[in-house]
C-alpha cells in the first residue's frame, strides 16, 4: 500500500498537501510561507534545481519573521537529507530572531542531529505518531526512539497523533509514550478526499464519506485509550505557547506592519477564518 512521493520520503497516503485537491492547489500557488493560528511556516522549494525559487528562500526578508513562532518545511519532512542545507540555514539564521523555531516530523532523528537541536534553546520538536505504518514509510518504533533521544538531550518535544483515522490507527504505542516520560498528546482528525477510498477499508470510510474538505475526528474510543495510558489531551497550540520564549517582542504597530507585508508571500493553511489567523500572527509578535 505504500507509495513513493517525490515531495516527501514518508509518502503518507493521506497527505493533505499531495492528496487533497484544493490544498494541493493552495501550496502550488504559494509554497514559501504558510500561516495558521499557531505558527508561520517557512518552506524550502520542492525543486532545488530552480535557482530563482531557491533565491527566494535564501533571500527571504527575515525581518518579517522576527518575534514570531516559525516552523521549518511543512510541505515535506523537515529532516529529509535533501533539505539538510536549508535546515542548517534555518537553524542558523531564523532561530535566533524568533520566539520558537519548530519542526514537525515523522522521520527518525539521529543522535548527532539531536545534539545539535539541543543547543538551540527555543527549538521545539513535534513528532507525529499515527499508528498508520501500513500507509506510511516510517515506523512507530523509530518515532518513539526519536522521542527517547529528545528526553536524553533535553530537547523540548511534543507528540501529535496526526491524523487519527478511525478504524485504522493503532494506538497501542500510548503506554510506551507514557513510559518514556511524555504526559500529554494532541489528536488531529483527517481531511478526507475521495481518492483515499483506494486504500481505506469500508469500516473506516463510513466515518468520512461525504465530509470532503473538513477535518473529521470521530469519537470511536480514542479518548478512553489516552486516559487509560495515563496521558492527557493538550493542543499543540497550548503546548507551544507554554514552552515558548517571551523574547523578542515587537510593538503592535510594527507587528501589524510586518504581518501585512508577510501576507504578500503567504498561503493561509488553516480551517480558521483568515482574519483570525492574521490577528493571531500579530499577537504572537507582541
Model-flagged regions — what are they?
Residues 54-225:
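Conserved AdoMet/S-adenosylmethionine-binding subsite of the radical SAM
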Residues 1, 13, 72, 283-285:
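Intrinsic disorder/low-complexity detector
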Amino acid at each position: 500500500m505504500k507509495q513513493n512521493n517525490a515531495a516527501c520520503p514518508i509518502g503518507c497516503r493521506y497527505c493533505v498537501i499531495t492528496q487533497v485537491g484544493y490544498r494541493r492547489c493552495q501550496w502550488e500557488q504559494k509554497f514559501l510561507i504558510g500561516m495558521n493560528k499557531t505558527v508561520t511556516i517557512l518552506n524550502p522549494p520542492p525543486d532545488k534545481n530552480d535557482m530563482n525559487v531557491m533565491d527566494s528562500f535564501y533571500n527571504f526578508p527575515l525581518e518579517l519573521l522576527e518575534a514570531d513562532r516559525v516552523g521549518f518545511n511543512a510541505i515535506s519532512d523537515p529532516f529529509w537529507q535533501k533539505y539538510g542545507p536549508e535546515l542548517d540555514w534555518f537553524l542558523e539564521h531564523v532561530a535566533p530572531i524568533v520566539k520558537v523555531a519548530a519542526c514537525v516530523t515523522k522521520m527518525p532523528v539521529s543522535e548527532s542531529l539531536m545534539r545539535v537541536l539541543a543547543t538551540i534553546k527555543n527549538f521545539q520538536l513535534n513528532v507525529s505518531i499515527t499508528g498508520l505504518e501500513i500507509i506510511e514509510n516510517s515506523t512507530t518504533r523509530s518515532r518513539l526512539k526519536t522521542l527517547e533521544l529528545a528526553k536524553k538531550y533535553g530537547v523540548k518535544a511534543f507528540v501529535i497523533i496526526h491524523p487519527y483515522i478511525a478504524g485504522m490507527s493503532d494506538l497501542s504505542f500510548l503506554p510506551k509514550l507514557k513510559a518514556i516520560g511524555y504526559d500529554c498528546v494532541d489528536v488531529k482528525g483527517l481531511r478526507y478526499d475521495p481518492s483515499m477510498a483506494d486504500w481505506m477499508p469500508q469500516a473506516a470510510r463510513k466515518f468520512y464519506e461525504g465530509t470532503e474538505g473538513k477535518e473529521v475526528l470521530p469519537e470511536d474510543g480514542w479518548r478512553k485509550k489516552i486516559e487509560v495510558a495515563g496521558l492527557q489531551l493538550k493542543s499543540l497550540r497550548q503546548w507551544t505557547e507554554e514552552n515558548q520564549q517571551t523574547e523578542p517582542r515587537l510593538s503592535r504597530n510594527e507587528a501589524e506592519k510586518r504581518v501585512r507585508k508577510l501576507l504578500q508571500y503567504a498561503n493561509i493553511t488553516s480551517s480558521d477564518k483568515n482574519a483570525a489567523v492574521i490577528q493571531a500572527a500579530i499577537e504572537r509578535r507582541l
